[in-house]
């Protein structure tokens, strides 16, 4: 079957993963193949393998996360997740407010913002990622962890964009501010990365540099923090980030690259147990995740 425009989502039913595609914003197909392969097939010839189904209430799943024995989850298992940082002017300014390392009088964030080479870092593996309605985590040894709402791209092994999604690059900012060499510990741990609820194909995003991104932190039923930005403020363009990611660095099909944040809540807005994080990106949707503080190991 040939269509234009596709949204891909996945559910768990009685322990089994089932992938679906919403085609032309109306028809729902149960996919006959791995969702990463389905994205690649669609990218090549707009073909989708699967059967039309009814009875899947996608909008209700988004609201309640689970209906009977069906629960929405992350749309794919990305073999690798990579991040790019300080790609917006606002991030450079906010990160540089902290007492962090300097090089020749400039903070490391100011230096990388002005440098030719962007910041690219390894972020997560599938077991460290969660999806819509699943809990992101605050490290047991962090007292200042922030959500980082970002537009992310799903890539094939050549760096071609297969689709777009919403990502939360959860970061233990106190660890990173203490010492830049602690960045991997700040960025990589169980529950450090959320994405979804869907992956939308490139034909649904006519211009990735005109998307509104909104972050809300809800605490005890009230909006505790809210911020927004448009991707037209992105200085490090996605194509440049991809080129540096794949330079001398082979990536597998289905790799996700998240493209940086411009919304950086202050030190007094750190996440707490039972907070709710909501990230909305126009033309994609809203990713909602509860927050859980990991227990210290004694």
Curated annotation (Swiss-Prot):
Q: What is the designated name of this protein?
A: 2-dehydro-3-deoxy-D-arabinonate dehydratase
Q: Name one GO biological process term.
A: protein homotetramerization
* Source organism superkingdom: Archaea
Keyword field contains Nucleotide-binding: no
Q: Which residues are noted in the entry as Mg(2+)-binding?
A: 148, 150, 169
Species this chain originates from: Saccharolobus solfataricus (strain ATCC 35092 / DSM 1617 / JCM 11322 / P2)
Q: Where does substrate bind?
A: 86, 187, 261
User: Which EC class is this protein assigned?
Assistant: lyase
An MF annotation (GO) of this entry: hydro-lyase activity
Gene3D superfamilies assigned to the protein according to its UniProt record, in alphabetical order: 3.10.330.40, Fumarylacetoacetase-like, C-terminal domain
Family affiliation: Belongs to the FAH family.
EC assignment = 4.2.1.141
Write out the function statement from the record.
Participates in a pentose oxidation pathway that converts D-arabinonate to 2-oxoglutarate.
Sorted UniProt keywords = Calcium, Carbohydrate metabolism, Lyase, Magnesium, Metal-binding
């Amino acid at each position: 079957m040939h269509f234009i425009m596709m949204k891909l989502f996945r559910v768990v039913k009685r322990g089994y993963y089932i992938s679906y595609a919403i085609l032309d914003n109306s028809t729902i197909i149960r996919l006959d193949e791995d969702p990463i392969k389905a994205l690649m097939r669609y990218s090549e010839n707009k073909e989708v393998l699967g059967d039309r189904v009814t009875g899947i209430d996608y909008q209700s799943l988004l609201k309640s996360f689970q209906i009977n024995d069906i629960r929405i989850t992350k749309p794919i298992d990305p073999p690798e997740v990579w991040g790019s940082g300080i790609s917006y002017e606002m991030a450079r300014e906010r990160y540089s407010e902290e007492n962090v390392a300097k090089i020749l009088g400039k903070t490391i964030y100011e230096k990388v913002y002005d440098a030719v080479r962007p910041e690219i870092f390894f972020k997560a593996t599938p077991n460290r990622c969660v999806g819509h309605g699943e809990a992101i985590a605050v490290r047991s040894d962090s007292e200042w962890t922030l959500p980082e709402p970002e537009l992310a791209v799903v890539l094939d092994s050549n760096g071609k964009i297969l689709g777009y999604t919403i990502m939360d690059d959860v970061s233990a900012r106190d660890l990173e501010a203490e010492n830049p060499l602690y960045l991997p510990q700040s960025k990589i741990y169980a529950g450090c990365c959320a994405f979804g609820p869907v992956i939308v194909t490139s034909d649904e995003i006519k211009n990735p540099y005109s998307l509104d991104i909104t972050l809300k932190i809800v605490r005890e039923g009230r909006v505790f923090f809210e911020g927004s930005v448009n991707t037209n403020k992105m200085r490090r363009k996605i194509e440049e980030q991809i080129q540096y990611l794949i330079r001398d660095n082979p990536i597998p099909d289905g790799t996700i690259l998240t493209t940086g944040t411009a919304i950086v809540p202050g030190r007094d807005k750190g996440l707490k147990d039972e907070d709710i994080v909501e990230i909305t990106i126009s033309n994609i949707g809203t990713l909602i995740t509860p927050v859980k503080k990991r227990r210290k190991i004694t």
